[in-house]
């Protein structure tokens, strides 16, 4: 791949204004990535974004960068790249996947409140997506891990009501049987009685 890297570098250097120069820059970054040198790949991706900011390849660049940091368990960085992606490319075909990934990143980084909010945003932004039930369950999990039983209880119930046939609803029903969720059920029932 040294030959490929060299060839792409030559194209970018000799023909920076050519319509395919951005493609060559992207291929250069991929060649570095495939050879295991992500630092060089990252530099080439950043150069692509800076030099060709209108390139349709920018979305792919951001996905690859976020993926790299996710796979290397650098979840806060992966989440930030994902959030920037969603700001720039909200209508992209992979926007829902990236939005879900942002929630996963915050959860794995143990930023549970932010994870819950991210999964809620996913459910609001992509209500018909195949991951909508999972996002509601994971919102519940996130809030439960943040010791916010009230919000967790509500997300588990919403998952169960809105997506009754899903695997996520099955897991949500299991979580609702936890002692802290049963206590929350009693607290909510008592508050309804007291309001009447």
Residue ranges of model-derived segments:
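Acidic, polar-rich low-complexity tracts and alpha-helical solenoid repeat scaffolds
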Residues: 1-196
